[in-house]
C-alpha cells in the first residue's frame, strides 16, 4: 500500500546558474530556517521536531536510544524538505520505527564530511525497522554504509550501494532479516509513472566481478524501485531516469526543468530567499561548506556543535576572508579586531608572524593547536608524560618548528620522549618577560633522556637559566647557552655537576602522606610541609610519583630507566605553602585499580638534602562496567543456554549479570506482500559487494589462514574471510559506536571566565551510587499461553539456562545482557569514597530464533472436509481444513496435493493457495476432474519451511449416467419454459390492470408488517436511564447522551445515546419512531449500531442506542480537515489512508450483514454512518430501511424525499432499491471519505445530478486518490446493477489491509457469511462506458444538511448550493446543460495527500 506520505511531498526546487550569474524568478522561496546545524535526537520522538523546516543539515543527524515507543509514535513526523546531510546519518536502538520513508522521503545526498568510523550511514540494532525506504537517496559522497543487527529489516541487499558510494568504499551489511522470508522486489514500481504513462521498471543490478549467474532486481521496498541514473549523468537524474544538469545537480531534479536541482553539486546561494546553484560564489559572498553566504551571515555563523566544549573559541568564530568563511586566518595573515569587535584577516607586509597565546604542551593534540605559530605571546611549557610515540619528535617538528619568539619563559619538564630541543628549529629569542619559574626564563627539569638543547644559538632576554636533574644532559651543553648569553646567570650553577649529567644519590628524609578521598578516576593525596632545610627558599617544590600496582610489589626505580616506556607517572607541585599541608589531586586514573604512590621534594641544597615518602597503595572507586562480550545463545535438547564473556573492564566487584529476554513477535506485514506460490524457490540474496568489514591494515596469520582468506567465494556466497578478524572488526566498530552514543554530560561552567577546577566538581557531595535501571524487570507470560513475553533473571555466572518451554517455538527473541557491580567500600574511615558512576553497564543485544517444533505445522486431520460438488457440466471437489493452531511462525501458503489412485503412473498435482486467499475461502476448489478414485493431502508452509502433508483422504467421483442426464436436462428445460410463460403472463396482467388501481409495497416479513408497537423484552424502565447533555438533532427529535444503569435485570453503568421524539409529533410519527426500533431489534453484529432498549410506556418515547462518541462520519471527516478551525493547537490530523481503508471495510461488513438479513438501507451516506470512541465505523439511522425478505427490490412511491446524490440510476429512474443500489451508494461514501466529506457532484443542481446519473455519468477521481481505491468506486458505480460487486466481494478485496481486530469481530468471518459467500455466483465485472464528472468548480455557498435529500414527486427538486472550498469542482460534462462559467480549481483537501 502506497504510503500517504508520497502524496504530501514538498520538494524545494533549486535552480542552476553558472559562475556568479544571478537569474531571478527561477524557483520558489526556501522556508525560513532551511539550513540547520547538527541534530541529536535521543530518548523521545518528540525531539524530531528539531528537523522541522530543515532543507540542509550542515553536520550530522543522530537518532538514538528511543525506547518503549511504537510505530504510531512516528506517524506525525515527516521532513520532506530535507534533501542533504553534509556529514553522516546515525540510527541506533530506535524502537517502533519501521521505515525511514516517512521521515526522509526526499533525502538525496549524504556528503560524509565527517564519518562514524568509516561510514556515512549507520543503522544499528533497530528492533522493528522493516525497510530503509530512503527512496530519493542517490549519492553518498564519502564513506560507506553499515547496516547491522536489525532482525526485521528487509530490502537491505536489494540496493546497489556501490552505485551511491565512491569506488573502493567498503559497505557492511549483516545480521538482518533473512531474504527468503522477505518480500521480493517488484518488476515495476507502483508509485512512479513514466512520462509515457507506463510504470517505472525496477533495474537489474550490474554484474561485477564476473558473477553472471547472480542477478538481482534493485528496489527500496515492494513499491519503489531504486533509481539508477544513465551513464551520462551519474547520480543526477529524476526518479523516472531523465538526466538532470549533471554539471550542477546532484541527487536529482524537478521536472520538467532539468536545471531545477534537488541538491547543488558544487555551491548554492540564497539571494532574496531564492536558492540557486552556482559553480563559484558571486562577488561579496563567501564560500561556507557547500553554500555561499553574505558577510553578515558569515559573522553570524555559530561554532559547530562538536566544538561547543571548547571555551577558548568564541560563539561566533567565523571570519569572511578572500571569498571563504573561515574560523582562522590563513598563513601570512594576522587577525585584526576592531574597536567594534569586527574581526578580519590582514595580510602582512613581508613575513607575517602568526601570534598565539601561551600554551602547555602535554600531548600531540595540544601541540597541533600551535601549528604555524611564530610568536608566542606568553610562555611555552612542554611536559610530555606519555610513554610512547615513535614519531613524536617528527610531530613536534611539524607543529612547533615555525616558532621564532617566546615572550615569556620556556619550561621543559619531565618529557621522557625528548632527546633534544632541536624541534624548535626557528626559535631565536626567549624574552623572559612577565612571571617566571624560579626567576628563570629557561627552565629545564627532570628530563630523563634529554641529551641536547638547541642546534643553533638562542638569545635569552631576561631572567636566569635553571637546569635540574637532567641525568643525560651534560653541563657543557648548558654552559654553551650561557656562553652565548654572557649576561645571563645560572640559578643553581653550583649544583650543575651534581644533578645534571649524573645520577648522584641524595640525603633523603621521610615524608608522611595520607589519602583523603578517592573517586573512580581521581584521588586526593595530602602531606605535611617539608621543614628540614635550613633555608626554606631551597625547597623548589614536590613531585608525586604514581603507578598501577596490581600486586603491591613495586620499587622506587620501576620504569625509571631511559629505555622503558612503562613506568612511574609523575606530577610536580610548585604552588605550596610552607605553613600548611599540601594537597594534590591525581586525575585520569582507571576505575577500581590499585595504584602505588610516593612523594619527593625538589631542593637546592648543596648537600643533596631532600624528602621522600614510603610507597603506599590505594584502590580507586568502582566505575561503570563495560559491556559483556561474545554473547551466544544455543539450544540443547529441552534447555536454552545463554553464554557470554565477562566485560574487558569490570571496574568493580561483580554483583550479577542481568539477563532480560523479550519476545519480538513476527508481526511483519511485509511478509504477506510476497507471493510464496510464485517465489517459492527464491534463495537469500547474495550481495555482490563484500558485506564484511575490511581486514586490519596489519595482521599476522598462518599460511593456511592466508590461503583461506584468499579463496574465491563459495557457492553460498561466503567470502572465505577469517571469522576471528571479522569478529574483531565488529567489536571495534561497536566500541566506536558506543563512544558516539553514550556521552557524559559536560560539567556546567562559565564559558567567559576560566577558573580553577573545584574539588566539589570532581568529588560531589552526593555520593549515592547510581544505577542505569533501564532494564525492565518484568517476568510475564503471554496471555492464555504457557510461554513468556518477558523473562528477567540475574546470575553470577557467565551463562544461564532456561527450560525451552519458556519460549514459543520458532519465534524471535531479543536477549539483553549487562553486567552490574557492587558499591565501593572506603579503604579506611578517614578516607572518603566517591561512588557516583553507574552500577550497571550498557546492554548488549543478541537476537535469536528458537528452534522449530516438529508437527506444529501439520494440518489437523480431523478438520479436513471433502465435499464433491459435481454437476452436469463439470466435476469438482471442495476441500476445506483448519490451519495449524500454533505453527512455526506465520503461515505463508498451503499446498493441496491430489492424485488418481485407481490408475498407475499418474503423478500428483499440486495446487498452491496463498494464506491471504485461504483467509477468504478457508479451502480450495479442485476443478476439471475426471471420474475416478482420488487421494487428497494438505500441507502448510510457514517461514520455517514446509510442514508434513496430512494423511491421505479418499473420494470417489462416479461416472455420469448419460440417459439420466438427458432426462434431467429435458425436464429442466420444460420447467423453465412453463415458468417463463407464467412469469410473463403475471407481469403483463400486473402492469396492465393492477398498476392502474394501486401502487403496491411488498412487505413480506410478518415482523415488519405490523403498525402497532408491542411491548416486549426490549422494554426498559424509565428510572433506569440518566439523561445527560445534548448530542444533536436526530431524525425524529433531540438525541442526548446518557447512562443506562440497569439492562435486562443486570446492573450496569453503560454510556448510551437516548433518541427522543418531538413533543409535537403525531401518533403516526411516534409509530414510525418505534418502527425504527423494531427494525434494530433484528440486528446483532459489530458493525451495525446496536439497540439497547426502548421506553414506549409514557411520554416521551425513548429509544436507547449504543453510544457513538465521535458522531456521524460526515461531521468527523470535516472536523479533521487540515485547516478546520476548532480552537485547538494543533489541529486534528486527517485520517491516514490505512484508517480510511479500515473505515471502508467496516462499513462494507455492516452492509453485508444487512444484505444477508435481506434488508436494503436506501440511504447509505457518510451522515448515516456513526464513529465510535475507538474509531470503529458502524451503520446507523434506519429511518428509511426496508425489509425485503422474499423480494429482490423495493419500489418507492412518488412522494417524499430522496438522497439523489447517493442514489443509483435504477433508483432515480424507476424507484427500484436493492442491495446493488446500496453498493452504488457505498461508492459515493468512499468518495466522501477520500475528499473529507465534500459534497458529491459538486457544482450540479439536484435536477442535473438526476439526469447526469441516469445518463451514465460518474464522478472524477478525487485529487491524490490511489488507483485501487478509485477503481473500487468505479466498480460500485457500474450502470448495470448486476455488474457491481457484492459487499462480500468488497470485503474480500479490502481484507489484506484490515486490522487484526477486524478478523475477530467481523460478520464476514461468521458461518452465515461463509454460507452466503459460497452461494454467490462469480460475476465478471466489466467497466462500462460511463462518463466521468470532469473537475471544474463554482463559487456557491455551503449547503445545509437537508440539501442531501431532495423532494421528489410532489415536492420540487430544488437547486442545491455547492460545497465550501474543500469541494469537488463543477462538471464539464456534455450530458449537463448550462453548467455556468469555469473557474480555477481551488484547494480540495484529501486525506490521501
Swiss-Prot record:
Cited SUPFAM superfamilies: Fibronectin type III, Growth factor receptor domain, L domain-like, Protein kinase-like (PK-like)
FU repeat placement: 240-287
Region (Disordered) residue spans: 754-779, 1328-1365, 1374-1393
Any one Gene Ontology molecular-function term assigned to this protein's record: ATP binding
Tissues where this protein is expressed: Highly expressed in the brain and ovary.
Record's bilayer topology term: Single-pass type I membrane protein
Bilayer-crossing regions: 967-987
Catalytic activity entry: L-tyrosyl-[protein] + ATP = O-phospho-L-tyrosyl-[protein] + ADP + H(+)
The protein's enzyme class: transferase
Segments of skewed composition (Basic and acidic residues): 768-779
Biased composition (Acidic residues): 1338-1348
Subcellular localization: Membrane
Stretches assigned to the Protein kinase domain: 1025-1302
A GO CC term attached to the entry: axon
Known cofactor(s): Mn(2+)
Residues that coordinate or bind ATP: 1031-1039, 1059
Glycosylation site residues: 76, 196, 257, 322, 340, 439, 457, 492, 553, 765, 772, 793, 796, 871, 919, 933
Record key words, sorted: ATP-binding, Cleavage on pair of basic residues, Disulfide bond, Glycoprotein, Kinase, Manganese, Membrane, Metal-binding, Nucleotide-binding, Phosphoprotein, Receptor, Repeat, Signal, Transferase, Transmembrane, Transmembrane helix, Tyrosine-protein kinase
Regulation: Activated in response to insulin. Autophosphorylation activates the kinase activity.
Name the record gives this protein: Insulin-like receptor
Underlying gene: InR
Amino acid at each position: 500500500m502506497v504510503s500517504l506520505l508520497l502524496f504530501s511531498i514538498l520538494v524545494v526546487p533549486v535552480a542552476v546558474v553558472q559562475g556568479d550569474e544571478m537569474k531571478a524568478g527561477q524557483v520558489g522561496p526556501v522556508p525560513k530556517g532551511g539550513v540547520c546545524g547538527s541534530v541529536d535526537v535521543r530518548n523521545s520522538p518528540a525531539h524530531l521536531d528539531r528537523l522541522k523546516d530543515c532543507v540542509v543539515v550542515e553536520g550530522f543527524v543522530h537518532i538514538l536510544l528511543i525506547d518503549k515507543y511504537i510505530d504510531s509514535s512516528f506517524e506525525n513526523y515527516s521532513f520532506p524538505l530535507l534533501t542533504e546531510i553534509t556529514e553522516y546519518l546515525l540510527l541506533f536502538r530506535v524502537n517502533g520505527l519501521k521505515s525511514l520513508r516517512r521521515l526522509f522521503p526526499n533525502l538525496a545526498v549524504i556528503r560524509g564530511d565527517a564519518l562514524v568510523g568509516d561510514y556515512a550511514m549507520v543503522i544499528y540494532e533497530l528492533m522493528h525497522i522493516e525497510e530503509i525506504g530512503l527512496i530519493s537517496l542517490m549519492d553518498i559522497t564519502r564513506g560507506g554504509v553499515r547496516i547491522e543487527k536489525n532482525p526485521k529489516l528487509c530490502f537491505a541487499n536489494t540496493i546497489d550501494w556501490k552505485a551511491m558510494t565512491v569506488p573502493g568504499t567498503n559497505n557492511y551489511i549483516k545480521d538482518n532479516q533473512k531474504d527468503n522470508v522477505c518480500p521480493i522486489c517488484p518488476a515495476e514500481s507502483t508509485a512512479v509513472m513514466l512520462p509515457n504513462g507506463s510504470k517505472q521498471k525496477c533495474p537489474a543490478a550490474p554484474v561485477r566481478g564476473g558473477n553472471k549467474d547472480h542477478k538481482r532486481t534493485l528496489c527500496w521496498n515492494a513499491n519503489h524501485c531504486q533509481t539508477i541514473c544513465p551513464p551520462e549523468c551519474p547520480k543526477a537524474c529524476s526518479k523516472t531516469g531523465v538526466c538532470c544538469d549533471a554539471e550542477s545537480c546532484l541527487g536529482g531534479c524537478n521536472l520538467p526543468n532539468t536545471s531545477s536541482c534537488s541538491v547543488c553539486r558544487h555551491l548554492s546561494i540564497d539571494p532574496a530567499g531564492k536558492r540557486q546553484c552556482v559553480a563559484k560564489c558571486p562577488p561579496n559572498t563567501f564560500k561556507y561548506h557547500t553554500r555561499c553566504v553574505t558577510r553578515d551571515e558569515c559573522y553570524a555563523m555559530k561554532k559547530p556543535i562538536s566544538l561547543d566544549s571548547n571555551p577558548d573559541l568564541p560563539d561566533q568564530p567565523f571570519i569572511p576572508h578572500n571569498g571563504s568563511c573561515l574560523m582562522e586566518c590563513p598563513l601570512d595573515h594576522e587577525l585584526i579586531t576592531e574597536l567594534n569587535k569586527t574581526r578580519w584577516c590582514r595580510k602582512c607586509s613581508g613575513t607575517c608572524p602568526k601570534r598565539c597565546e601561551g600554551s602547555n604542551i602535554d600531548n600531540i593534540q595540544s601541540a597541533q593547536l600551535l601549528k604555524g605559530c611564530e610568536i608566542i605571546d606568553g610562555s611555552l611549557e612542554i611536559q610530555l608524560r606519555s610513554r610512547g610515540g615513535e614519531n613524536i619528535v617528527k610531530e613536534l617538528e611539524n607543529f612547533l618548528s615555525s616558532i621564532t619568539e617566546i615572550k615569556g619563559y620556556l619550561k621543559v619538564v619531565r618529557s621522557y620522549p625528548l632527546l633534544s630541543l632541536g624541534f624548535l628549529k626557528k626559535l631565536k629569542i626567549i624574552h623572559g618577560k612577565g612571571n617566571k619559574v624560579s626567576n628563570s626564563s629557561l627552565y629545564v627539569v627532570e628530563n630523563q633522556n634529554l641529551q641536547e638543547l638547541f642546534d643553533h644559538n638562542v638569545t635569552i632576554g631576561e631572567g636566569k637559566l635553571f637546569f635540574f636533574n637532567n641525568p643525560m644532559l651534560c653541563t657543557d651543553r648548558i654552559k654553551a647557552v650561557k656562553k652565548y648569553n654572557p649576561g645571563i646567570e645560572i640559578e643553581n650553577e653550583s649544583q650543575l655537576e651534581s644533578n645534571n649529567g649524573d645520577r648522584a644519590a641524595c640525603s633523603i628524609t621521610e615524608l608522611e602522606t595520607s589519602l583523603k578521598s578517592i573517586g573512580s578516576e581521581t584521588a586526593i593525596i595530602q602531606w605535611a610541609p617539608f621543614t628540614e632545610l635550613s633555608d626554606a627558599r631551597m625547597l623548589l617544590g614536590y613531585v608525586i610519583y604514581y603507578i598501577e600496582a596490581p600486586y603491591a610489589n613495586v620499587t622506587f626505580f620501576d620504569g625509571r630507566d631511559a629505555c622503558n616506556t612503562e613506568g612511574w607517572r609523575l606530577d610536580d607541585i610548585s604552588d605550596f605553602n610552607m605553613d600548611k599541608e599540601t594537597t594534590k589531586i591525581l586525575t585520569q586514573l582507571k576505575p577500581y585499580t590499585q595504584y602505588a604512590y610516593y612523594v619527593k621534594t625538589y631542593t637546592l641544597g648543596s648537600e643533596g638534602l631532600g624528602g621522600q615518602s614510603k610507597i603506599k597503595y590505594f584502590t580507586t572507586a568502582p566505575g561503570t562496567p563495560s559491556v559483556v562480550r561474545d554473547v551466544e545463545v544455543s539450544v540443547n535438547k529441552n534447555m536454552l543456554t545463554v553464554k557470554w564473556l565477562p566485560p574487558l573492564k569490570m571496574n568493580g566487584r561483580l554483583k550479577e549479570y542481568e539477563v532480560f529476554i523479550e519476545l519480538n513477535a513476527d508481526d511483519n506485514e511485509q511478509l504477506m506482500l510476497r507471493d510464496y506460490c510464485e517465489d517459492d524457490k527464491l534463495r537469500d540474496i547474495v550481495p555482490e559487494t563484500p558485506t564484511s568489514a575490511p581486514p586490519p591494515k596489519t595482521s599476522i596469520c598462518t599460511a593456511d589462514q592466508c590461503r583461506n582468506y584468499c579463496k574465491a567465494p563459495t557457492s553460498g556466497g561466503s567470502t572465505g574471510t577469517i571469522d576471528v578478524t571479522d569478529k574483531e572488526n565488529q567489536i571495534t566498530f561497536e566500541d566506536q559506536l558506543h563512544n558516539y552514543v553514550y556521552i557524559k554530560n559536560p560539567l556546567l561552567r562559565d564559558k567567559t571566565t576560566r577558573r580553577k577546577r573545584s574539588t566539589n566538581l570532581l568529588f560531589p557531595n552526593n555520593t549515592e551510587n547510581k544505577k542505569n535501571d533501564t532494564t525492565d524487570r518484568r517476568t510475564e507470560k503471554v496471555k492464555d499461553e504457557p510461554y513468556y513475553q518477558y523473562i528477567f533473571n540475574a546470575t553470577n555466572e557467565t551463562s544461564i539456562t532456561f527450560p525451552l518451554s519458556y519460549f514459543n517455538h520458532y519465534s524471535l527473541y531479543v536477549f539483553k545482557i549487562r553486567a552490574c557491580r557492587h558499591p565501593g567500600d572506603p579503604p579506611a574511615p578517614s578516607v572518603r569514597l566517591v561512588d557516583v558512576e553507574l552500577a550497571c553497564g550498557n546492554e548488549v543485544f543478541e537476537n535469536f530464533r528458537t528452534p522449530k517444533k516438529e508437527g506444529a505445522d501439520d494440518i489437523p486431520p480431523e478438520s479436513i472436509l471433502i465435499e464433491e460438488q459435481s454437476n452436469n457440466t463439470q466435476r469438482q471437489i471442495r476441500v476445506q481444513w483448519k490451519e495449524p493452531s500454533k505453527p512455526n511462525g506465520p503461515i505463508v501458503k498451503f499446498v493441496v496435493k491430489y492424485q488418481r489412485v485407481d490408475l498407475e503412473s499418474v503423478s500428483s498435482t499440486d495446487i498452491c493457495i496463498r494464506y491471504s486467499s485461504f483467509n477468504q475461502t478457508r479451502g480450495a476448489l479442485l476443478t476439471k476432474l475426471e471420474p475416478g478414485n482420488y487421494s487428497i493431502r494438505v500441507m502448510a508452509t510457514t517461514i520455517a519451511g514446509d510442514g508434513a502433508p496430512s494423511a491421505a483422504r479418499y473420494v470417489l467421483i462416479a461416472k455420469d449416467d448419460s440417459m439420466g442426464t438427458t432426462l434431467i436436462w429435458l425436464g429442466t428445460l420444460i420447467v423453465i419454459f412453463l415458468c417463463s410463460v407464467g412469469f410473463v403472463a403475471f407481469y403483463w396482467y400486473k402492469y396492465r390492470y393492477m398498476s392502474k388501481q394501486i401502487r403496491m409495497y411488498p412487505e413480506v416479513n410478518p415482523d415488519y408488517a405490523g403498525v402497532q408497537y408491542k411491548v416486549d423484552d426490549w422494554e426498559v424502565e424509565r428510572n433506569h436511564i440518566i439523561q445527560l447533555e445534548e448530542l444533536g438533532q436526530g431524525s425524529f427529535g433531540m438525541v442526548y447522551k446518557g447512562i443506562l444503569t440497569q439492562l435486562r435485570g443486570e446492573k450496569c453503568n453503560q454510556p448510551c445515546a437516548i433518541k427522543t421524539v418531538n413533543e409535537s409529533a403525531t401518533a403516526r410519527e411516534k409509530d414510525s419512531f418505534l418502527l425504527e426500533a423494531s427494525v434494530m431489534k433484528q440486528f446483532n453484529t459489530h458493525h451495525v449500531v446496536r439497540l439497547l432498549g426502548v421506553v414506549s410506556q409514557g411520554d416521551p418515547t425513548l429509544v436507547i442506542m449504543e453510544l457513538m462518541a465521535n458522531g456521524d462520519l460526515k461531521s468527523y471527516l470535516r472536523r479533521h480537515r487540515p485547516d478546520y478551525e476548532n480552537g485547538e493547537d494543533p489541529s486534528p490530523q486527517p485520517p491516514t489512508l490505512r484508517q480510511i481503508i479500515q473505515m471502508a471495510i467496516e462499513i462494507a461488513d455492516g452492509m453485508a450483514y444487512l444484505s444477508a438479513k435481506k434488508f436494503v438501507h436506501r440511504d447509505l451516506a457518510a451522515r448515516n454512518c456513526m464513529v465510535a470512541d475507538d474509531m470503529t465505523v458502524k451503520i446507523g439511522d434506519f429511518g428509511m430501511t426496508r425489509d425485503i425478505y422474499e423480494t429482490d427490490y423495493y419500489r418507492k412511491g412518488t412522494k417524499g424525499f430522496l438522497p439523489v446524490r447517493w442514489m443509483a440510476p435504477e433508483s432515480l429512474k424507476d424507484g427500484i432499491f436493492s442491495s446493488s443500489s446500496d453498493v452504488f451508494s457505498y461508492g459515493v461514501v468512499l468518495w466522501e471519505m477520500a475528499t473529507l466529506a465534500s459534497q458529491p457532484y459538486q457544482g450540479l443542481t439536484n435536477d442535473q445530478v438526476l439526469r447526469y446519473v441516469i445518463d451514465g455519468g460518474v464522478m472524477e477521481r478525487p485529487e491524490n486518490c490511489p488507483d485501487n481505491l478509485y477503481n473500487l468506486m468505479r466498480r460500485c458505480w457500474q450502470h448495470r446493477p448486476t455488474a457491481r460487486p457484492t459487499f462480500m466481494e468488497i470485503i474480500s478485496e479490502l481484507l489484506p489491509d484490515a486490522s487484526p481486530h477486524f478478523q475477530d469481530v467481523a460478520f464476514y468471518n461468521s458461518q452465515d457469511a461463509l454460507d452466503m459467500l459460497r452461494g454467490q455466483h462469480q460475476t465478471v465485472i466489466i467497466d462500462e462506458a460511463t462518463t466521468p464528472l470532469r473537475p471544474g468548480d463554482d463559487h456557491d455557498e455551503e449547503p445545509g444538511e437537508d440539501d442531501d435529500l431532495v423532494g421528489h414527486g410532489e415536492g420540487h427538486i430544488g437547486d442545491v448550493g455547492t460545497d465550501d472550498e474543500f469541494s469537488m469542482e463543477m462538471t464539464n460534462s456534455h450530458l449537463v446543460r448550462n453548467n455556468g462559467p469555469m473557474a480555477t480549481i481551488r484547494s480540495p483537501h484529501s486525506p490521501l495527500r
